[in-house]
UniProtKB/Swiss-Prot annotation:
<protein>
    <recommendedName>
        <fullName>Phospho-N-acetylmuramoyl-pentapeptide-transferase</fullName>
        <ecNumber>2.7.8.13</ecNumber>
    </recommendedName>
</protein>
<dbReference type="InterPro" id="IPR018480">
    <property type="entry name" value="PNAcMuramoyl-5peptid_Trfase_CS"/>
</dbReference>
<keyword id="KW-0131">Cell cycle</keyword>
<feature type="transmembrane region" description="Helical">
    <location>
        <begin position="289"/>
        <end position="309"/>
    </location>
</feature>
<feature type="transmembrane region" description="Helical">
    <location>
        <begin position="198"/>
        <end position="218"/>
    </location>
</feature>
<dbReference type="Pfam" id="PF10555">
    <property type="entry name" value="MraY_sig1"/>
</dbReference>
<keyword id="KW-0132">Cell division</keyword>
<dbReference type="GO" id="GO:0009252">
    <property type="term" value="P:peptidoglycan biosynthetic process"/>
</dbReference>
<keyword id="KW-1133">Transmembrane helix</keyword>
<dbReference type="InterPro" id="IPR000715">
    <property type="entry name" value="Glycosyl_transferase_4"/>
</dbReference>
<keyword id="KW-0573">Peptidoglycan synthesis</keyword>
<dbReference type="GO" id="GO:0046872">
    <property type="term" value="F:metal ion binding"/>
</dbReference>
<keyword id="KW-0460">Magnesium</keyword>
<keyword id="KW-0808">Transferase</keyword>
<feature type="transmembrane region" description="Helical">
    <location>
        <begin position="158"/>
        <end position="178"/>
    </location>
</feature>
<keyword id="KW-1003">Cell membrane</keyword>
<comment type="function">
    <text>Catalyzes the initial step of the lipid cycle reactions in the biosynthesis of the cell wall peptidoglycan: transfers peptidoglycan precursor phospho-MurNAc-pentapeptide from UDP-MurNAc-pentapeptide onto the lipid carrier undecaprenyl phosphate, yielding undecaprenyl-pyrophosphoryl-MurNAc-pentapeptide, known as lipid I.</text>
</comment>
Length: 375
């Protein structure tokens, strides 16, 4: 626990202290946000606000992770060094953040709403996602556990949904596809949620906070300890909890400057990097489907865009919402930006609570704690 506390505080301090320095750096170079003309009129005042703040969040994550492990080693705390799971998850996070950085930098330098072309962004994300998936199925520990498994998971692996049903080679190929689908879904979900001051930052912090609890619980109920009923076959759960704690702290530190009126935006650097991190946590903690519940707000926002675009094409130009994503619909209905953000945070908290309840309920059922219910 001391490791999680040190990591979380370090992430918070590095992010909170580093963000204003980064703001000055961006302002000095004129790196400001480009605002679309067809967006809500209240957003016109956001034009020129420094962006790419995700670089501070991700940078704080990496730096705090390395410093924490170093400090724990010096203090003689038996926490273990950086693990394969931790390093591979960081690779995915940093890789996706890099794609977002290129996209942000292109928008800023060319002063347009389109950065990378959709095809270019998809290709870069697929390359990083594929590298992540392949690495995640390697590096077995002393029990033979790799960071990821080929089984599709809900609150844990589902044995009868193993993608390696036709052999290891087919399993790897299908897992690469499945992993890329998850990564694409989470990165786009965070990206679409990042439209109002502090919305995506706060919502993501709630989800990563949930992954601190999930990973901690998996560590305490690991099959490596006693192999009791309902135990978890997860590699490096404590290191995953550390990363989740650091990222939560980094997000809260950034939120101090990102809350309304925002002094800086996370940009695609942040949204894609955070989406990559959420995908990594979901895959490594064997909660690939459950993450859709934890991130229920982001799922709803993403669906609002899909529904809007789909109905617009089918109906010949009609719209379901005043504007998509969903948060802008409520803005146009007259809700103040802060009102939308706080109410959406509450919805996100509800989703996270339901997700954690499902996760714990799954374990409880396997202990025989819910009579008449089978896992």
């Amino acid at each position: 626990m001391i490791g999680l506390l040190i990591g979380g505080v370090l992430g918070l301090v590095l992010s909170a202290a580093g963000t204003p320095l980064f703001i000055r750096f961006l302002v000095k170079r004129g790196y400001g946000q480009f605002v679309r003309d067809d967006g809500p009129t209240t957003h016109k005042t956001k034009r020129g606000t420094p962006t790419m703040g995700g670089a501070v969040i991700i940078g704080s994550l990496v730096l705090a992770y390395l410093i924490t492990h170093g400090l724990l080693a010096v203090l003689g705390v038996d926490f273990g060094g950086p693990t394969a799971s931790g390093l591979i998850l960081l690779l995915l996070t940093v890789g996706m953040a890099f794609v977002g950085f290129v996209d942000d930098f292109t928008k800023i330098t060319k002063q347009r709403s389109l950065g990378l072309t959709p095809r270019g962004k998809i290709i870069l994300q697929a390359l990083i996602g594929t590298a992540f998936a392949v690495l995640a199925l390697n590096f077995p520990d002393e029990r033979g556990l790799t960071p990821a498994s080929t089984a599709i998971s809900f609150a844990r692996d589902i044995p009868w949904l193993d993608l390696a049903f036709a052999g290891p080679a087919i399993g790897v190929i299908l897992f690469v596809i499945w992993s890329n689908l998850i990564t694409t879904a989470t990165t786009n979900a965070v990206n679409l949620t990042d439209g109002l001051d502090g919305l995506a930052t706060g919502a993501t912090a709630m989800i990563t906070g949930a992954y601190v609890l999930i990973s901690l619980f998996q560590s305490s109920q690991s099959c490596a300890l006693e192999g009791t009923r309902g135990c978890y076959e997860v590699r490096d759960p404590m290191d995953l909890a550390l990363l989740a704690a650091i990222l939560t702290g980094s997000l809260l530190g950034f939120l101090w400057w990102n809350t309304s009126p925002a002094k800086i935006f996370m940009g695609d650097t942040g949204s894609l990097g955070l989406g990559g991190a959420l995908a990594g946590f979901a895959i490594f903690t064997r909660t690939e489907i459950l993450v859709a519940v934890l991130a229920g707000l982001m799922v709803a926002i993403t669906l609002s865009v899909i529904i809007q675009v789909g109905w617009f094409k089918v109906s010949g130009g009609k719209r379901v919402f005043l504007m998509a994503p969903l948060q802008h619909h409520f803005e146009l209905k007259g809700w103040a930006e802060v009102t939308v953000v706080v109410r959406f945070w509450l919805l996100s908290l509800m989703c996270v609570t339901v997700g954690l309840a499902i996760f714990y309920g799954d374990w409880l059922i396997r202990q025989g704690g819910l009579a008449g219910v089978t896992p």
